[in-house]
Amino acid sequence: MAPRPPTAAPQESVTFKDVSVDFTQEEWYHVDPAQRSLYRDVMLENYSHLVSLGYQVSKPEVIFKLEQGEEPWISEGEIQRPFYPDWKTRPEVKSSHLQQDVSEVSHCTHDLLHATLEDSWDVSSQLDRQQENWKRHLGSEASTQKKIITPQENFEQNKFGENSRLNTNLVTQLNIPARIRPSECETLGSNLGHNADLLNENNILAKKKPYKCDKCRKAFIHRSSLTKHEKTHKGEGAFPNGTDQGIYPGKKHHECTDCGKTFLWKTQLTEHQRIHTGEKPFECNVCGKAFRHSSSLGQHENAHTGEKPYQCSLCGKAFQRSSSLVQHQRIHTGEKPYRCNLCGRSFRHGTSLTQHEVTHSGEKPFQCKECGKAFSRCSSLVQHERTHTGEKPFECSICGRAFGQSPSLYKHMRIHKRGKPYQSSNYSIDFKHSTSLTQDESTLTEVKSYHCNDCGEDFSHITDFTDHQRIHTAENPYDCEQAFSQQAISHPGEKPYQCNVCGKAFKRSTSFIEHHRIHTGEKPYECNECGEAFSRRSSLTQHERTHTGEKPYECIDCGKAFSQSSSLIQHERTHTGEKPYECNECGRAFRKKTNLHDHQRIHTGEKPYSCKECGKNFSRSSALTKHQRIHTRNKL
């Protein structure tokens, strides 16, 4: 394990290395699950705070791994540690694969040299000892520097005991004066200053992943990560002796009797088995809600205190969790780090990618106990179950009206707040269940900051807003270099993608590809229920609702629900009386465009619907259907 004290130049910005702790693979597998959870919380929160404080910190690989649920250890070659050949390994370290050069140490952590890997590594106590070393070299001035907030200390006291509480001073030195920075270790008497070249690791751009797997095309930032990944294809063990899953010789292999999944730690197996048993031993003292994991309880308790320590530096919005802040900031940056390996679609949230991947597999693990209908998403099942229970958990705090689905409530709130449905600071939304609040927390944070002055429409992302403006203006927002990038459209008003069959032109390549399927007949999107195929993904989504019964679009006036947004728009015109489609010949207006087309045939005399029995022609399909009943009755 390699904690790093601050070593930056006097006026240099803080780097994430200054507040990070690294593990090798061997060290990580000796950290018990509770301490792993603490480590994840601390690392993610420290990174989030550096970003929120305005530091230009590129995202390290360890943060990518933690966000995606991967194990965060890195190879020994990537950990910057001085080497001491005269250091002697403790005799208690019995595992043969550990009898090698483990004499690397980072910045005076002499006490860490004697920590046996046969014992469980205690993250918080190791960090406390590291802090004592730092304070010995840095002096009292270091303790006055600005702090990076760690998880709730009271909760950590209850979880690990007061003496093992993570010391927040560990990561406080953001701008330490040069005169109190250590350059020589008093314990070992060796110069431990970093080589300047080693500090350039952050020059690797977070989004660039140059190392790709030849078999599955998955990309990685570091070659060591690719090497580790390739072993999963070869079936090799993760360790030199060929052992799998980090199981050392002599360690007991804990296997779940329900699903066969294996674990290194008995505590890991115990936590996993709660999925099968439904046990939730950690209960909130305030509301009584129970959780499977103590970390989930700690996050939940923040909701009662109302504390929101994580603030966005761009819009000022505050959050109770660092992960919520990180997700919120992607609204401003447009970042979508979670990419589907099958279709290339990207998402802002890992959960969204997980839900999307189910559409490729066709798996529907969520089944209704009432009618047996199955769904690919838990949220779809929850919405469906309300058709049986009649539950309407989303209540308007202004007029008291309740809705079965959150989108219906958001649309309703526009009546009260004139098109600002997401500004939760201007009004409150009451939820009858705390689970509903949790599910919609990320949705409520979606502020539509970009306003179109021409038509009044609001947008959450600047890319959507820029695309929309092309409708109103021919002004060129791109310079010539940007215009020919893969993702940018050439110039506003231009339609560079032209169909060579019918000549129709499009602004976007995706629209052109979808249109071209009309000519080729290609229908790549197939329904898993009935086998019907579609040329567009959106058409398949709408079709699948005929099987699930899902109707997410609800009329705020009468409560009637629809499976398609276009059907809701047409229905709402029955309340407003709006008839936007007007005949140029006689001035008659209609609510539906199809009704206008049918009407215009009166003027043109066109009769495109022909009876196959007698050859009679009709201007409307409904008239043909009615006529065909005559032939059907005659045959009977």
From Swiss-Prot:
<feature type="zinc finger region" description="C2H2-type 4">
    <location>
        <begin position="310"/>
        <end position="332"/>
    </location>
</feature>
<keyword id="KW-0238">DNA-binding</keyword>
<dbReference type="Pfam" id="PF01352">
    <property type="entry name" value="KRAB"/>
</dbReference>
<feature type="zinc finger region" description="C2H2-type 5">
    <location>
        <begin position="338"/>
        <end position="360"/>
    </location>
</feature>
<feature type="cross-link" description="Glycyl lysine isopeptide (Lys-Gly) (interchain with G-Cter in SUMO2)">
    <location>
        <position position="448"/>
    </location>
</feature>
<dbReference type="GO" id="GO:0005634">
    <property type="term" value="C:nucleus"/>
</dbReference>
<dbReference type="InterPro" id="IPR013087">
    <property type="entry name" value="Znf_C2H2_type"/>
</dbReference>
<feature type="domain" description="KRAB">
    <location>
        <begin position="14"/>
        <end position="85"/>
    </location>
</feature>
<dbReference type="InterPro" id="IPR001909">
    <property type="entry name" value="KRAB"/>
</dbReference>
<dbReference type="GO" id="GO:0006357">
    <property type="term" value="P:regulation of transcription by RNA polymerase II"/>
</dbReference>
<feature type="zinc finger region" description="C2H2-type 3">
    <location>
        <begin position="282"/>
        <end position="304"/>
    </location>
</feature>
<dbReference type="GO" id="GO:0045893">
    <property type="term" value="P:positive regulation of DNA-templated transcription"/>
</dbReference>
<dbReference type="GO" id="GO:0008270">
    <property type="term" value="F:zinc ion binding"/>
</dbReference>
<protein>
    <recommendedName>
        <fullName>Zinc finger protein 90 homolog</fullName>
    </recommendedName>
</protein>
<keyword id="KW-0678">Repressor</keyword>
<feature type="zinc finger region" description="C2H2-type 9">
    <location>
        <begin position="497"/>
        <end position="519"/>
    </location>
</feature>
<dbReference type="GO" id="GO:0001227">
    <property type="term" value="F:DNA-binding transcription repressor activity, RNA polymerase II-specific"/>
</dbReference>
<feature type="zinc finger region" description="C2H2-type 11">
    <location>
        <begin position="553"/>
        <end position="575"/>
    </location>
</feature>
<dbReference type="InterPro" id="IPR036051">
    <property type="entry name" value="KRAB_dom_sf"/>
</dbReference>
<keyword id="KW-0862">Zinc</keyword>
<comment type="function">
    <text>Inhibits the transcriptional repressor activity of REST by inhibiting its binding to DNA, thereby derepressing transcription of REST target genes.</text>
</comment>
<feature type="zinc finger region" description="C2H2-type 1">
    <location>
        <begin position="211"/>
        <end position="233"/>
    </location>
</feature>
<comment type="similarity">
    <text>Belongs to the krueppel C2H2-type zinc-finger protein family.</text>
</comment>
<comment type="subunit">
    <text>Interacts (via N- and C-termini) with REST (via zinc-finger DNA-binding domain); the interaction inhibits REST repressor activity.</text>
</comment>
<keyword id="KW-0479">Metal-binding</keyword>
<feature type="zinc finger region" description="C2H2-type 7">
    <location>
        <begin position="394"/>
        <end position="416"/>
    </location>
</feature>
<dbReference type="GO" id="GO:0000977">
    <property type="term" value="F:RNA polymerase II transcription regulatory region sequence-specific DNA binding"/>
</dbReference>
<feature type="zinc finger region" description="C2H2-type 12">
    <location>
        <begin position="581"/>
        <end position="603"/>
    </location>
</feature>
<keyword id="KW-0832">Ubl conjugation</keyword>
<keyword id="KW-0804">Transcription</keyword>
<feature type="zinc finger region" description="C2H2-type 6">
    <location>
        <begin position="366"/>
        <end position="388"/>
    </location>
</feature>
<feature type="zinc finger region" description="C2H2-type 2">
    <location>
        <begin position="254"/>
        <end position="276"/>
    </location>
</feature>
<feature type="zinc finger region" description="C2H2-type 13">
    <location>
        <begin position="609"/>
        <end position="631"/>
    </location>
</feature>
<keyword id="KW-0677">Repeat</keyword>
<keyword id="KW-0539">Nucleus</keyword>
<keyword id="KW-0863">Zinc-finger</keyword>
<dbReference type="InterPro" id="IPR036236">
    <property type="entry name" value="Znf_C2H2_sf"/>
</dbReference>
<feature type="zinc finger region" description="C2H2-type 10">
    <location>
        <begin position="525"/>
        <end position="547"/>
    </location>
</feature>
<dbReference type="Pfam" id="PF00096">
    <property type="entry name" value="zf-C2H2"/>
</dbReference>
<keyword id="KW-0805">Transcription regulation</keyword>
<keyword id="KW-1017">Isopeptide bond</keyword>
<feature type="zinc finger region" description="C2H2-type 8">
    <location>
        <begin position="450"/>
        <end position="472"/>
    </location>
</feature>
